[in-house]
């Protein structure tokens, strides 16, 4: 698979190891005829040691086939997150490093996740596109605030902060996009 086709969360073989791509930066050439380069921030799977590498857009990487199991968040055990397989009730434990920044989107009862397995051991987590989280703290709506469409910060039950419209109040449940971290609307 070409480096330009890789996405965040992809698992690749590189330099005699298996790595998950956590961040991708694209750099465009400054002059004529330059090649587009991709800089990947990767973490070893399992283990979590960080590696940064740059690739040309046409450079080939070997994608590793993952087994994906649908699971729901069960509980937190210290720094580890435990997920329950929806089909056979197997428990999968992922440490905080494997979860990474996604920890802010994981709340009690979260379902629709996919635990990614290599050789039957859990290595990564794929969240649903949107999650429902409760607003625990946000400033009150200003009078006339709906006319200006000013966003305001809102602290969510998991500890992360997102920008929300003025009309959102403390205690409301909202949709949050897990890819961008942006407000996605009120939860029904």
Curated annotation (Swiss-Prot):
Entry-linked SUPFAM superfamilies: Nucleic acid-binding proteins, Translation proteins SH3-like domain
InterPro entries with a match to the protein in the record: Elong-fact-P_C (IPR015365), NA-bd_OB-fold (IPR012340), Rib_uL2_dom2 (IPR014722), Transl_elong_fac_P/YeiP (IPR020599), Transl_elong_KOW-like (IPR013185), Transl_elong_p-like_YeiP (IPR011897), Transl_elong_P/YeiP_cen (IPR001059), Transl_elong_P/YeiP_CS (IPR013852)
UniProt GO MF annotations: translation elongation factor activity
Cellular component GO terms, alphabetical: cytoplasm
BP-aspect Gene Ontology terms: peptide biosynthetic process
CDD domains xrefs: S1_EF-P_repeat_2
Source taxon at top rank: Bacteria
Gene3D superfamilies tied to this protein: 2.30.30.30, Nucleic acid-binding proteins
Protein family: Belongs to the elongation factor P family.
Name of the protein described by the UniProt record: Elongation factor P-like protein
Origin species: Xylella fastidiosa (strain Temecula1 / ATCC 700964)
């Amino acid at each position: 698979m070409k480096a330009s086709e890789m996405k965040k969360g992809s698992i690749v073989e590189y330099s005699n190891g298996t790595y998950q791509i956590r961040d991708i930066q694209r750099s465009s050439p400054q002059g004529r005829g330059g090649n587009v380069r991709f800089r990947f921030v990767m973490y070893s799977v399992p283990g979590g040691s960080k590696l940064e590498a740059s690739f040309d857009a046409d450079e080939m990487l070997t994608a590793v086939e993952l087994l994906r199991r649908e699971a729901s968040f069960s509980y937190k055990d210290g720094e580890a997150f435990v997920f329950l397989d929806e089909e056979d009730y197997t428990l999968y434990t992922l440490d905080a490093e494997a979860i990474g920044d996604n920890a802010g989107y994981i709340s009690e009862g979260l379902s629709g996740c996919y635990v990614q397995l290599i050789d039957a051991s859990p290595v990564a987590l794929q969240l649903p596109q949107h999650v429902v989280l409760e607003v625990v703290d946000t400033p009150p709506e200003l009078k006339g605030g709906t006319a200006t469409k000013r966003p305001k910060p809102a602290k969510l039950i998991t500890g992360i902060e997102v920008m929300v419209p003025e009309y959102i109040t403390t205690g409301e449940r909202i949709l949050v996009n897990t890819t961008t971290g942006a407000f996605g609307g009120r939860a029904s």
